[in-house]
Swiss-Prot record:
Record field: catalytic activity: D-glucuronate + ATP = 1-phospho-alpha-D-glucuronate + ADP + H(+)
Lineage: Eukaryota, Viridiplantae, Streptophyta, Embryophyta, Tracheophyta
Enzyme class: transferase
Example GO molecular function: ATP binding
Binding site for ATP: 126-136
Site residues by UniProt (Transition state stabilizer): 24
Keyword Electron transport: no
EC number: 2.7.1.43
Cofactor note: Magnesium. Can also use other divalent cations like manganese or cobalt.
Family: Belongs to the GHMP kinase family.
Descriptive protein name: Probable glucuronokinase 2
SUPFAM superfamilies in alphabetical order: GHMP Kinase, C-terminal domain, Ribosomal protein S5 domain 2-like
Matches recorded under InterPro entries: GHMP_kinase_C_dom, GHMP_kinase_C_sf, GHMP_kinase_N_dom, Glucuronokinase-like, Ribosomal_Su5_D2-typ_SF
Cofactor(s), by name: Mg(2+); Mn(2+); Co(2+)
Length: 366
């Protein structure tokens, strides 16, 4: 992919639309978004997914030449690909969002023209790293559909994460709204309140954009061999639904970390921020257990903590966000430890909110 990608929207005059959606870091409060909690999340400029929609005579969902590969050198090569990358590429994601988008518009009286299109995608988000790669593809595709059908102002921005999540649910993907909110808001730092009362009333949370510059310098650690981010919630959710007091109280404490984190960020109290990040991971570990989290994922956190940095999962495993409060000297130690352990480490690239004027107009006043 182009390391210097085009603007989010291009080619309006000829009916061609291109959109990017960035990888996401769950900074504090995750995974309480699935449990009526609170989170702080943001997207990063390090990785992104890209979708392109162009008018065509027939409706075509275009397979990716690598991610949707159907031709192999040998049977062994086919099996190797399936064992490492699974059975699924991005075509199913594009088809699912097309279905969910069309049904939502039909159910809500939003008229769509009858022109056809070709929809394609690309992505450089590492697979299974807990950076929300699947929803980034769906988010980028949804943005293309909104523009192609000229219905951006008819579908409020708060509703769009639900459409993305519903598309993923069609495919059996286990997730919450947090990632989709961060990606729909297109950058910036977002505080999210998923309180049950509000969710039951309107179907989405209370989303507040914060200044991305409140964040201290952060780093990303990830491993090239993937983690399974689709099964991590399963056992804990069942216990939560069964009324397990330990799970319920621990999840409430994780949600509280997002509130404390918002205060710490506004005050730039980074020493407290370090403690909150570490506490977030410790609570997750106590609920899910080491076997569920995976030895390599835990090792990434411990590599950072070994040199006195704060660390937690960006999502459900596969990547870790790190804060080095002591600055460049501590970053050098982090880089050396990651090199020894075979992990990739790089600075987090922050991106400001990319909401357009038409998007902002759809924000509810409630």
């Amino acid at each position: 992919m182009d390391p210097n990608p085009k603007p989010a929207i291009s080619g309006k005059d000829n009916g061609v639309f291109e959109h990017r959606s960035f990888a996401r870091i769950g900074f504090l409060g995750n995974p309480s978004d699935v449990y009526f909690g609170r989170t702080i999340s943001f997207t990063i400029g390090n990785f992104w997914a890209w979708a392109k929609l162009e008018p065509s005579d027939h409706l075509l969902i275009k397979p990716h030449p690598f991610h949707d590969l159907v031709q192999f050198d040998s049977l062994d090569n086919l099996v190797y690909r399936l064992e490492n990358d699974g059975y699924y590429g991005g075509v199913r994601l594009l088809m699912a969002i097309c279905k969910v988008f069309r049904n939502y518009c039909k159910e809500n009286g939003i008229q769509l023209h009858d022109k056809n299109f070709t929809l394609s995608y690309d992505t450089n988000i590492p697979r299974q790293t807990g950076l929300s790669g699947s929803s980034a593809i769906v988010s980028a595709a949804l943005s293309c559909l909104l523009d192609f059908y000229n219905v951006r102002q008819s579908i409020r921005i708060e509703v769009r994460p639900n459409l993305i999540l519903n598309a993923e649910k069609e495919l059996g993907i286990v997730a919450g709204l947090q990632d989709r909110v961060a990606q729909v808001y297109g950058g910036g730092l977002v505080h999210m309140d998923f309180s049950k009362e509000h969710m039951d009333k309107v179907g989405y949370g209370i989303y507040t954009i914060m200044d991305i510059n409140l964040l201290p310098p952060l780093h990303l650690i990830y491993a090239e061999n993937p983690s399974d981010s689709g099964k991590v919630h399963s056992t804990v959710r069942r216990r939560w639904l069964d009324g397990d007091e330990f799970i319920i109280s621990s999840m409430a404490e994780i949600a509280k970390l997002a509130e404390e984190g918002r205060t710490a960020l506004l005050k730039k109290d980074y020493s407290n921020l370090k403690e909150l990040m570490n506490r977030n991971f410790d609570l997750r570990r106590s609920m899910f257990g080491d076997e569920c989290l995976g030895a390599m994922n835990i090792e990434m956190v411990e590599v950072a903590r070994k040199i006195g940095a704060a660390a937690k999962f960006t999502g459900s495993g596969g990547a870790v966000v790190v804060f080095c409060p002591e600055g460049p000297s501590q970053v050098k130690l982090l880089e050396e430890e990651c090199r020894k352990s075979g992990f990739i480490v790089e600075p987090v690239k922050l991106v400001p909110t990319r909401l357009s004027s038409s998007d902002i107009k759809t924000l509810s006043k409630t």
